[in-house]
UniProtKB/Swiss-Prot annotation:
Lineage: Bacteria, Pseudomonadati, Pseudomonadota, Gammaproteobacteria, Moraxellales
One Gene Ontology MF term: signaling receptor activity
Protein name (record): Probable TonB-dependent siderophore receptor PiuA
Keywords: Cell outer membrane, Disulfide bond, Ion transport, Iron, Iron transport, Membrane, Porin, Receptor, Signal, TonB box, Transmembrane, Transmembrane beta strand, Transport
Domain TBDR beta-barrel, chain residue ranges per copy: 172-743
Mode of membrane association: Multi-pass membrane protein
Family according to the record: Belongs to the TonB-dependent receptor family.
Chain ranges of the TBDR plug domain: 61-167
């Protein structure tokens, strides 16, 4: 297979590059070993508190920004040893994970404050929202902006957005990494080396090799990943700088299939996941797979026009592929009531190419007594996507896109398995790739962000953005429908405004208002079906939302500890809903009222903490209809129900304490309330508490040993609730021992 050959080449290149970096850096360390400051930094732990966003659109420090922002710091990533973005986001309360496109559970689909942020994922401030599983090996930190924010990020951003900050070349020499092994065949190696060549030139490379099986699942899901992320920067400490970077990640997985819901025929808790043995696997290993490949190339140019004004241009080209065949443990024919599960096929072949260019002018200036910190810019992006899937052809020549014997009428065909004791049997049919459609999404925008200091105690935050959006999908002819093209062209203005009062230098009290817009076709080609464009919804206006927020932020203990609190309401007022089989209208409504608390930083020089709590009171205030195969069901009977994927209460805690100069221990907990998967509130997963622990021992100034145990109590809980069919069971207890090194 070409993917396997490519992986071998990537691994070989990665190892060669890493060994070269190790040798070079080791010699450099030997040559300058008389400099004690380098050694001190090698073992120093960073704070869990972050004061400034790495995104230039945050023109003021986070303390003075009238918006809720949670930062998953580098230290928190290292403490918890999270390896994927999905795992990292579980450290932020108010975020839940939903099933991906077509019910596929194997792509990042976070919900922030109740609304999907699948289309609001960014890398270094540039949209990167194709369906994929994102890795952490080349990520410095993750910034979660909460509330409507289209003035900053463009279309989408109803409940918030997620921005991953990349590791890029910088000043100084260092080499760090980790070699880890654990339960469930866990093996992981990461290397991160930076070399400062002098004369303003530095290079950096991050390398990954990873594999594991799903914890608590025997002969089930498997995950394999390799990646490399080199970068080089020119002009450090000069007025003109250039950074060139490349990112590559390849995955080869056997995906998990989830646990089917109970149905009413069983006389049990209808809608709750089936009470089968923890770790039960319904996938068809002889058939199922998921292969992803991601390439991202970036050129960033910066020039300081003056000491206070900088112009920046960032161009990014991204190419991604998501190819999978996955088992949906289908319950639609009443099979679960018979003690059976059908191996329904879900599949996709998605190839996407995106070019984005951002031009920004940032800095500060005064107009009379007003002091401005600003970012004004323009953005252009174009994404092309080809999407298809797989058909199944049996020995008789029958063709299906989902499979055969859905009623489990012939168990000899291997299409069904036992609910309580599923077995693996050969897949004797044939898969054949098929094209479905291609899509193009193009957007152009200009924006202005300004934070104005009226007096040292009063700040005004303003933002305005105009977007022009064009989407087109070309559907190929099928046996039941002719080929056709669907288009949507729209433009919209979004804005934000906030007032901050600073009673003291270390505190702020603010109120803010922000809007967002989501046009039809925003996720054309890869997103959830409700967000793609078709003949019936192509003339619909963009959805609109708004967030009102009142909050306060305080730095305590000599600015080492940060406390935040906010109350908010997000309203989505003209949601696209179906009126009849061929008609959509902007008449849907929903809202979320909430409250949240956050605490991050150092309580003492030995005690670090990151904690948060959210309360979300969500409501579907106006629903439309659900139409399938020409038949519609009135959804207005569910008005007043809780929104899917929204726990009423959620909390996270991570804390570490240095009990000895060489020994640090840590503990964490994650709590989530009951979550519904559907608007009818009939499919749901129960609340849970998960506990984690960590111990790190410094062997010497360069090497430490770290043990992480996740899900200490081996709690059976669920991370995703799909609208029908299944829920995703979380991993069982796992342990990982890592050797970390820093030079």
């Amino acid at each position: 297979m070409s993917l396997i050959r490519t992986r071998k080449k990537i691994v070989s290149s990665a190892i060669a590059s890493s060994l070269s970096m190790i040798a070079t850096t080791a010699m450099a360390q030997e040559a300058v070993s008389q400099l004690p400051t380098i050694h001190t930094k090698a073992t120093q732990e960073e704070s869990l508190k972050v004061d400034q966003s790495a995104n230039s659109k945050f023109v003021a420090p986070l303390l003075d920004t009238p918006k809720s922002v949670s930062v998953i710091s580098k230290q928190l990533i290292e403490d918890t040893k999270v390896t994927t973005l999905a795992d990292a986001l579980r450290t932020v309360p108010g975020i839940t994970l939903g099933a991906g496109e077509g019910g596929n559970p194997n792509g990042d689909r976070p919900f922030i404050r109740g609304y999907s942020s699948e289309s609001s994922m960014y890398i270094d401030g540039i949209r990167n929202s194709t369906s994929q599983n994102r890795e952490m090996f080349a990520v410095e930190q993750v910034e979660v902006t909460k509330g409507s924010a289209s003035a900053m990020g463009g279309a989408g951003s109803v409940g918030g957005s997620i921005n991953m900050i990349s590791k890029v070349a910088k000043k100084g020499d260092f080499l760090e990494g980790s070699v880890a092994a654990g339960t469930d065949n866990y093996q992981r190696i990461t290397l991160d080396g930076n070399k400062d060549f002098g004369n303003g030139i530095a290079a950096r490379v991050a390398v990954l090799g990873h594999q594991n099986e799903k914890a608590g699942q025997s002969n089930g899901a498997e995950y394999k990943r390799v990646g490399i992320a080199p970068s080089i920067t020119f002009g450090l400490d000069t007025p003109t700088r250039a950074t060139l970077s490349y990112y590559y990640l390849q995955t080869d997985d056997k995906p998990d299939s989830g646990i089917p819901y109970w149905d009413s025929s069983l006389g049990k808790a209808q809608g709750k996941p089936a009470e089968v043995k923890q770790g039960t696997y319904y996938g068809w290993k002889d058939r199922d797979f998921q292969k992803q490949e991601n390439h991202i190339g970036t050129i960033k140019l910066e020039h300081d026009l003056t000491d206070n004004i900088t112009i920046t241009n960032t161009a990014m080209y991204a190419k991604s592929k998501n190819d999978y065949v996955w088992t949906n443990p289908d319950d639609s024919k009443g099979n679960v009531g018979k003690g059976l599960v059908w191996h329904r096929l879900n599949s996709a072949i998605t190839d996407s190419e995106t070019f984005t260019d951002q031009l920004a002018l940032t800095g500060k200036f005064d107009t009379g007594f007003l002091k401005h910190r600003f970012n004004v810019g323009a953005e252009y992006s174009k994404q092309k996507t080809d999407k298809g899937g797989y058909n199944i052809i049996d020995a008789k020549g029958n063709v299906s896109s989902t499979g055969f014997y859905s009623d489990c009428s012939d168990l000899s065909t291997n299409w069904c398995t036992s609910l309580n004791g599923p077995t693996q049997k050969p897949f004797v049919d044939r898969l054949q790739a098929r094209p479905d459609f291609d899509a193009t999404v193009e957007s152009t925008s200009v924006y202005l962000l300004d934070n104005i200091e009226i007096t040292p105690k009063w700040l005004l935050d303003l933002g305005l953005r105009w977007d022009k959006f064009e989407a087109e999908q070309n559907f190929l002819a099928t046996s039941s429908a002719a080929a056709y093209t669907a288009k949507n062209n729209s433009d919209f203005v979004t804005y934000q405004a906030g007032i901050t009062f600073k009673p003291t230098e270390n505190g702020s009290i603010y109120t803010s208002y922000a809007t967002s817009a989501s046009p039809v076709g925003l996720n054309a080609g890869w997103g959830d079906n409700s967000e793609t464009i078709n003949a019936n919804n192509q003339m619909i206006d963009p959805e609109e939302a708004q967030t009102f927020e009142i909050g306060t932020k305080w730095d305590f203990l000599d600015n080492h500890l940060n406390l935040t609190a906010a109350i908010f309401r997000t309203e989505k007022q003209n949601t696209r809903v179906q009126i009849d089989p061929t008609t959509y209208a902007n008449v849907g409504e929903s809202k979320v009222d909430g409250f949240e608390l956050g605490l991050n930083g150092e309580i003492t020089d030995k005690w670090n903490i990151s904690a948060g709590y959210t309360y979300l009171d969500s409501e579907l205030t106006k629903n439309g209809k659900s139409c399938r195969s020409g038949k519609c069901t009135d959804q207005s009977i569910y008005n007043g129900n809780q929104m899917p994927n929204v726990p009423k209460q959620a909390a996270t805690l991570w804390t570490t304490y240095k009990v000895l100069p060489q020994l640090t221990v840590g503990a964490g907990a994650v709590y989530s309330d009951k979550v519904y998967g559907d608007v009818a509130n009939t499919k749901w997963v129960p609340s849970y508490v998960r506990y984690d622990a960590m111990a790190r021992y410094n062997v010497n100034k360069n090497v430490d040993l770290q043990l992480n145990i996740n899900n200490l109590s081996d709690k059976r809980y669920f991370t995703k609730a799909y609208a029908s069919h299944y829920a995703t069971e979380a991993e069982g207890r796992s342990a990982v021992l890592a050797v970390n090194f820093k030079y």
